[in-house]
Amino acid sequence: MKNPLLRPWLTEKSTGLTEKKGQYVFKVKLDADKTDIKKAIEEKFGVVVKSVRTVNCLGKSKRQFTRKGVLQGKKSDWKKAIVTLAKDQSIDYYSGSTQKGEG
């Protein structure tokens, strides 16, 4: 697989995971597996990945009421990966580089 990483998933919950546990959340391709994700993060950011957990998220169904009737559709399914790094390592999302922690 070329690059399974799509983008960092920056939410209030994922930011809390980063601050408290040193875990980072990424949106990844649906067909990506844990080993591909681990290799991609280690190559791109130059860090040591301790573990990878993945979550398959189902897309929501949507309805729109119009004069001609009800239009039904569905948002796309997606997948996110929760990545735990080795101690004293971090990822800077904006520059694509890593920083060593003090301690």
From Swiss-Prot:
The protein's name: Large ribosomal subunit protein uL23
Any Gene Ontology biological process: translation
PANTHER family: 60S RIBOSOMAL PROTEIN L23A
Free-text function comment from the UniProt entry: One of the early assembly proteins it binds 23S rRNA. One of the proteins that surrounds the polypeptide exit tunnel on the outside of the ribosome. Forms the main docking site for trigger factor binding to the ribosome.
Single GO MF annotation: structural constituent of ribosome
Family: Belongs to the universal ribosomal protein uL23 family.
Keyword tRNA processing included in the entry's annotation: no
Transmembrane regions listed in the UniProt entry: none
Gene Ontology cellular component annotations, sorted alphabetically: ribonucleoprotein complex; ribosome
Pfam families (UniProt xref): Ribosomal_L23
Keywords, alphabetical: Ribonucleoprotein, Ribosomal protein, RNA-binding, rRNA-binding
Subunit structure: Part of the 50S ribosomal subunit. Contacts protein L29, and trigger factor when it is bound to the ribosome.
